[in-house]
């Protein structure tokens, strides 16, 4: 085994030579912030809460500006042992900014002490900071002064406590037995009653009373347990309030009680249609922490499975969109067609929707005999079938008239709300992580990135997904014809058990193997980050290791969360029927939103 790989895990990057660091020094001075060395791959800068808004404004307005607030969340640092490079801090709030123009990121961190965990809101700078700040307060109790509506967003309104704090229990057995009394039931029902005045919404204008309508949480066009409270003037939507959290299962909290390996099955279920696509950012982030380099065969196998699941998810999206507009037949065709993809996935992984097949350092096992024939049959059949969807439904004049120009927004609006994926590319912005920040060997493949003509509307979004399927087919053909030989797992002590004969000769090897199998591998203390182009936009994992067998903090940034936050800004002034079409064009599942 290559022992140098283990040593590389201690290597840290401070990105001091990054141009943005020099710009910050020239503008603010080098005494106003400190740089943290991590394995994230982007500059990480600590600033005070008094300065955070000035830094955000500067970064957003400078040339090659960071126009997108990609993520915002928190960390409870109180139980963290490895604090090298950290200031005095009990809680951290981090702001992850993304510049499409310069294809670069920067992370700003604000340290907070337990006596005063508050800082000013960034909602006046980035519109999408609203939900992220609400989630951070919900999970950690961190207060954002000046926020327009700092209330629960993931947890129920009556919830007590902040679940991602380290002193909050992580198991049901650590709580008192749950008893639902009549009084508590009435309290819960009352907390779900929509009170317009709490949201700053008026009951009427100077001449008419508004009607309030609950859309969901069990409406078929809501695509999951999702509620939108509509303020209506007749059929026109005056305003609306999306209400999420019904699908929340605490997947980030679960990571704190699972080993690095045993957490992999949970990643499948964050966006339950994506399968192996969701495993990719997690295993890549762990491999970055541990300094593991996987064989070429592993990279191509991972890409092959990811593109199979991308096609599978896109077929469901396209067919359900057609159903939302009024066409019933394609949805039944799609479920039949998707089974062909599941048959290939099952033959390779042994499972269908949630394979949990990627491993830290490789995949669970090698490709089975005959995999290439199964994939070839699928690729020979799929292109003509895709054209059938286009000609029969997507080019239909009724569908086009109900889709074109509906729920449209510009590139500027998309960046402001943190939109990624096909919805962003439909505005004309050519940004696909597989091309611009290639991972797992995507830079060795030839494929194009479909881009829209400047305005993202319902029709352009769905048609881009059609073209993305064509490009995924192109990638899969290259996997079929150019699959490298070699091992399916890295020869690394954190990923691969030692040969049996070695364990019989060296007791230390057997002990190490026993501990890794029973307790799990110990990943070096550090922080890492990995984003990927998932089925619905950019998905990423931000991992913090404290040098233990489990993650200290796992932050999962999903694309659907900001996409639903954008709904009110897009749909105001439209009809309820347009809302149905718009929701169908977003491509989301609530597990991806609520996590």
From Swiss-Prot:
- Its domain of life reads Bacteria
Q: Looking at the Swiss-Prot or TrEMBL record, what is one Pfam family this protein matches?
A: Complex1_49kDa
Chief location of this protein within or outside the cell: membrane
Q: How does it sit in the membrane?
A: Peripheral membrane protein
Task: Give me the ranges of the annotated region NADH dehydrogenase I subunit C.
Answer: 1-185
Q: Which reaction does it catalyse?
A: a quinone + NADH + 5 H(+)(in) = a quinol + NAD(+) + 4 H(+)(out)
Q: What is this protein called?
A: NADH-quinone oxidoreductase subunit C/D
What lineage, starting at the top, does this entry show?
A: Bacteria, Pseudomonadati, Pseudomonadota, Gammaproteobacteria, Candidatus Palibaumannia
Q: Which gene encodes it?
A: nuoC
């Amino acid at each position: 085994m290559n022992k140098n790989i283990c040593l590389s895990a201690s290597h840290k990057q401070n990105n001091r030579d990054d141009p943005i660091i020099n710009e910050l020094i020239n503008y603010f001075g080098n005494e106003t912030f400190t740089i943290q060395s991590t394995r994230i791959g982007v500059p990480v800068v600590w600033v005070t809460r008094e300065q955070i808004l000035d830094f955000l404004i500067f970064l957003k307005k400078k040339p090659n500006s960071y126009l997108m607030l990609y993520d915002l969340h928190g960390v409870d640092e109180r139980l963290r042992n490895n604090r090298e490079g950290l200031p005095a801090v009990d809680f951290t709030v981090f702001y992850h900014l993304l510049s499409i123009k310069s294809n670069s990121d920067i992370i700003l961190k604000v340290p907070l002490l337990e006596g005063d965990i508050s800082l000013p809101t960034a909602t006046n700078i980035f519109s999408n900071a609203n939900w992220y700040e609400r989630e951070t307060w919900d999970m950690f109790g961190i207060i954002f002064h000046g926020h327009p509506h700092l209330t629960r967003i993931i947890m129920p309104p009556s919830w007590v406590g902040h679940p991602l704090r380290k002193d909050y229990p992580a198991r049901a057995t650590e709580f008192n037995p749950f008893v639902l009394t009549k009084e508590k039931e009435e309290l819960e029902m009352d907390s779900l009653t929509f009170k317009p005045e709490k949201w700053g919404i008026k009951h009427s204008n100077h001449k008419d009373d508004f009607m309030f309508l609950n859309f969901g949480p069990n409406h078929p066009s809501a695509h999951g347990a999702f509620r939108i409270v509509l303020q209506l003037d007749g059929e026109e939507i005056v305003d609306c309030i999306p209400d999420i959290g019904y699908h929340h299962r605490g997947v980030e909290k679960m990571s704190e009680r699972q080993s690095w390996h045993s957490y992999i099955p949970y990643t499948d279920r964050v966006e339950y249609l994506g399968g192996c696509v969701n495993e990719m950012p997690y295993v890549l982030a762990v491999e970055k922490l541990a300094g593991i380099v996987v064989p070429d065969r592993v990279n191509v196998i991972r890409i092959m499975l990811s593109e199979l699941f991308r096609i599978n998810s896109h077929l469901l999206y396209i067919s359900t969109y057609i159903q939302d507009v009024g066409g019933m037949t394609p949805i039944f065709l799609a479920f039949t067609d998707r089974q062909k993809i599941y048959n290939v996935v099952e033959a390779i992984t042994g499972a269908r929707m949630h394979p949990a097949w990627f491993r830290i350092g490789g995949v669970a096992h090698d490709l089975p005999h005959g995999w290439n024939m199964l994939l070839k049959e699928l690729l020979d059949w799929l292109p003509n079938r895709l054209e059938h969807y286009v000609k029969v439904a997507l080019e239909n004049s009724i569908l086009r008239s109900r889709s074109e120009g509906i729920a449209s927004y510009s590139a500027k609006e998309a960046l402001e709300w943190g939109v990624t994926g096909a919805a962003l590319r439909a505005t004309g912005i050519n940004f696909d992580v597989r091309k611009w920040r290639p991972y797992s060997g995507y830079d060795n493949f030839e494929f194009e990135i479909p881009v829209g003509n400047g305005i993202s509307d319902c029709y352009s979004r769905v048609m881009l997904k059609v073209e993305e399927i064509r490009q995924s087919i192109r990638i899969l053909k290259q996997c079929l014809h150019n699959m490298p030989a070699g091992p399916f797992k890295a020869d690394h002590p954190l990923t691969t058990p030692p040969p049996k004969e070695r364990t019989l000769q060296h007791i230390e090897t057997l002990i190490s193997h026993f501990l890794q199998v029973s307790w799990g591998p110990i990943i070096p203390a550090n922080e890492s980050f990995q984003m990927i182009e998932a089925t619905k936009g950019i998905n990423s994992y931000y991992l913090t290791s404290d040098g233990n067998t489990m993650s200290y903090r796992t932050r999962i940034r999903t694309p659907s969360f900001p996409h639903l936050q954008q709904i009110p800004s897009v749909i105001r002034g439209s009809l309820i029927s347009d809302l149905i079409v718009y929701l169908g064009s977003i491509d989301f599942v609530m597990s991806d939103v609520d996590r």
